[in-house]
Amino acid sequence: MKNLLSLLLLFTVINIFGQTPTPTQPIETSPTAISDVVSTKTISPVKKVPLDEALILIYDYDGTLFTFDLESETIAWTVKATDAYTEMCANKVTLIDGVLYVPFINGEIFAIDNQTGTIFWKSRIGNSTDQTVLKDQLPIIQEGKLFITAQNGNLYALNIKDGSLLWNYKLDSTNNDIPVLFFDNKVFTQSGSSFYSFEANTGKVLYQKSFEEPMSGKPVTDGENVFIANEKDVLFALNPNTPDVIWQFKLAENQHNVRERILCKDKKIYFAAQGPEASSIYALDSKTGTQLWKTDFKDDTIEYIIEESDNIWGYTRKAKLFQLDITNGEIAAETKLTTQPISNFEFPVDDSLFYYSDAALIQFDLKTKDENEVYLRTSIKDNAYSAYLKIIRP
């Protein structure tokens, strides 16, 4: 009996001191510790939807997504994220077969009927309610897959039919705020100082190339090679099949920060770089990296560029709207706006363009230079980060 009591006492002591103590308060998690898990809720099967071409989609800077009927001048439908710790858009929208694919900062991605706002499915990356999970993302959709990178260091491929996870890959950096490139059945993306190529179907890494500087530019292609700028002052041309650098172009002194201000057309690369004394738009031959022209904007900062009808359009931080001839870089038109754009440009069929300001949806008349308020917000928020527009059309 004495031996039995001694044995029981020994087991009790081991049990007490072998357990992990229960904390008296919740353990604080790292601000970057966002779960990699993807959860999905399918509401109805995705189907092809006719386009309601009277609508323009507005992803407002407070994170509200809605469509505005340009004919009746009324809001058609509104969708919001399930939850968000702050009011912010900070993302872009893709339209495929009448379905809108929308990322939200809380990690949610919705597939939405463009006509009614009905949600087909909801996916969520992680489960954070107090962090930005998706930032500056444009869903890239090809061959039934949606590709997107997140602030938890992952590249994801989702099935566009139901939002389910097909594959994901852990990248070098947790901060990923540049859309990926799909080209030749491959996915290209940057993360930290690395540039990756993936097999699109499986997520297999084809190559990972390291650079001396962080790679903060959006990857683009001319149909042959891939181009990406670093955070500092160099644009690289890369072979899409191997990590070989074909050529590199150094920006003018003290210029940097290309990011998403880059595009390709007709075997030429056009990009904008920022600097303390001037911003510049460059045109290069994509095969050789030879500079074709360069246009400077002194004492101002280029925020946005886009190609439309063989012109480079854009705006600056000082609310200057500009139009450049794509062949020689000459300024075809320049207007000092009374409202500061915070979105992309959308071009309807007439001689105008749409942009969003902190106060309204503006339709800018290219002939009269009038800024017409099409939709007016009921309130104005300070320090609006960004908004996004998309005319519903093929």
For each predicted feature, which ranges?
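Bacterial Sec-dependent N-terminal signal peptides
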Residues: 1-21
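Residues marking helix boundaries in flexible regions
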Residues: 15-17, 142, 327, 332, ...
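An edge-strand/N-cap motif at the start of beta-rich repeat modules
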Residues: 19-79
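Threonine-centered tandem repeat motifs in low-complexity domains
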Residues: 22-24, 135, 162, 242
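A short beta-strand motif characteristic of beta-propeller blades
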Residues: 30-39, 74-83, 118-129, 164-170, ...
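Repeat-blade elements of multi-bladed beta-propeller folds
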Residues: 39-64, 83-109, 123, 129-156, ...
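Short loop/turn segments that connect beta-strands within beta-propeller blades
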Residues: 70-73, 113-117, 159-163, 199-203, ...
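Short cationic/low-complexity microdomains
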Residues: 358-374
